[in-house]
């Protein structure tokens, strides 16, 4: 009664897990009676495969994501091991080992929440404001940008006749780069975009695995999309526009990332190392990304402020105790907001007033402990609103468990 791996790790390692059959060749007489053994090959048992996954963290993530579509990915910053890889909703893959019924298969295919999609490695989302970390780091690392430079956020920035709006209608007032990360001020990043070349930003983003494969050792990973000038010409037959850079620097527009990529982005920012994620246990060392340590430290401190200072967007999800968490919230917009809607007396339609499919995705990415990073975690909760409301609290509870038992 052999069973075969049909997806994921089990499919990739099926030959190792299965082993091989043995056999014996006999000489028999005319009656079929065995006279002697001629040749024999012993069966080879299947190998045990060790992974980095931690069952308790997997269970905790599934528990936290109950009733929520999305994904949770945790990477160990020391060895690149995937400690948690959860896609929600899921299904019982053991039902497939003996053949699934047509009724069950049709139900899975027709489920509007698509449980067959492994969102952790193949779900594609605009990263929203979590990507501002890369924009900010690129500005101070490669564009000689003064991190203390201030811009005034009135609630919008003009590019020609077009207005690009901040999420905060009344604006943030005067902010520097650290404030802009902490408060997630869109207008500050629009001003950065005025001075940025999209191709340079795109190339730097790939250092952090945005728009490129992570190298994880399981099949069916998608590489997402980091747009640039050549992509626009090739796929749209049009030249790149400056307004598209405005959208890109805040993680919107054409850009798409997987939850795994966002977790890996965070791990690489936290460590400054070219971490390569792995499900299968192996001992490895990672090369340096050669990013200026002072610039990385600036991003680290800004992420710390997001979670641990009163006006940070994730302050309500800060950790108590000695081990602190640094992070970045993101709200991934899935619809276009018209000028008429923005100028309504009541303002932009609230997320909860929209139909489910038009609501924003809630995103949070973080690492801990702050002074000695071990865990990098990304949470995406589809159509659940701002990153601070849903994804950040989920991440907090999962991180608390990881720090309490697996530090």
Model-flagged regions — what are they?
Residues 28-38, 78-129, 134-379, 384:
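Beta-lactam-recognizing serine transpeptidase/beta-lactamase-like catalytic domain environment
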Residues 31-71:
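Conserved, well-ordered alpha-helix/loop/beta-strand core segments that scaffold catalytic motifs
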Residues 6, 262, 387-400:
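Short, charged, low-complexity patches
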Residues 286-290, 300, 394-407:
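Short, gly/Ser/Thr-rich active-site loops of penicillin-recognizing serine hydrolases
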Residues 14, 18-21, 62, 66, ...:
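Amphipathic, well-packed alpha-helical segments that form the structural scaffold of globular domains
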Residues 54-58, 362, 396:
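Short, well-ordered alpha-helical scaffold segments within catalytic/effector domains
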Residues 3-27, 69-97, 201:
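Carboxylate/His-rich catalytic cores and anion/metal-binding grooves
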Residues 9-13, 269, 394-402:
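Short amphipathic C-terminal alpha-helix that caps PH/PH-like domains
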